[in-house]
């Protein structure tokens, strides 16, 4: 055993202690994707409820009425977080669960408030720091019906009322907040390509779309989202209960590399792509205005801020949330069809999975856009640090997907070596950015604790550290990635007592790699792992 301890001593490996004191490690979720209980707990309709029911063929014939029933199982799931040594959890507060009809004046759901109070209290009782997201795409359908949601500036005041109530009810205990989750995705997907709720786009962008105007509505919606963010931050900073709290936007940058590294136009296109994707929502919160390249390209279709709005937006964040998954090559486009405007043609870019030499950026994951490129996260953090005068960052999402529409055997889903490697390499990139580059990163949230309803991709895409058996009562089972995090996150005082367990884990992973290479059966090498007090087995 002495030799084993020397070989696998935690002190000589990568772990929690390699990060700054107080660095948060957690997992992320969203209300629509997790909560479920649609038919038993009061909640108003969201645009996603309507979209998936109205257009099932555009949503893999799935909905989130049940989701993974986090509403009823959150206590057990919090024990799972605790069991793998996580110390934070990011969740979203469902706007239509709090205001079923979208407006405070039309009724507040006390049961919804109680649910989030109970969730927050349970997290804190288990030593887990809550991070709450106010808007994770679930616009109340009532507001969509009344004034077309965020296409109207009326949404700003209703969102402000929602945010104010959340700060008042939960701000004494929740000290980390995200106003908007991925405004780029919400605007592009919902109003330019029409692939996500509410599914609006021009016919030349999406034949299935029944209404919308690509290249116009996308900018209007993002503009109103930014105004709503600024109002919410002002309310937050004026509420005594939120004293010492921090707030920001969860952006979703993709890192870009030039399609042809020797082509000046492709190199320039990478910078333009970053401005159109990240700068679009970041610049207004720093400088009070959109990037110059966007204003020049889009012209009158891009709304402008008043002096008062600009002032309110500047400095409206305490940290920059980063949802990073992958990277792409970018090719410059010289000529575009101005009669068919859209975000990508305005940016004059084309995303490519391979460069001019036929190379990908890394190993492909479960989806066509999911490439393992952890150095892209480090490059992005340095890009944003240098451009925006060293803000503080929070990695609010980072994850790897498996595709499971064919219902793969449970074993192959649980032995998620590629996901384990994905998280490890991205954490290494973050650690390098902190220690070698001087980037200030304060936390990391893996997407996601559990497999869940992945929006219009349904349940066939799995991101969880825990496997959810959709055909067996939504039972949860830890994957190898959960086991890895459990070991990675052990604190120094826990290490000496766990070296034998760690040896078994590492031996199993090495044997599994060998078995994958040789095609042999893996069943005899799978270790057992107790899950909290329930003593569930990893595999059975």
Swiss-Prot record:
A beta-D-glucoside binds at residues 33, 136, 181-182, 325, 397, 447, 454-455, 463. The keyword Membrane does not apply. SUPFAM superfamilies: (Trans)glycosidases. The active site is at residues 182, 397. The keyword Hydrolase applies. It catalyses: Hydrolysis of terminal, non-reducing beta-D-glucosyl residues with release of beta-D-glucose. Gene3D superfamilies: Glycosidases. One of its GO terms (molecular function) is beta-glucosidase activity. One of its GO terms (biological process) is carbohydrate metabolic process. It comes from the Eukaryota. This is Beta-glucosidase 27. It comes from Arabidopsis thaliana.
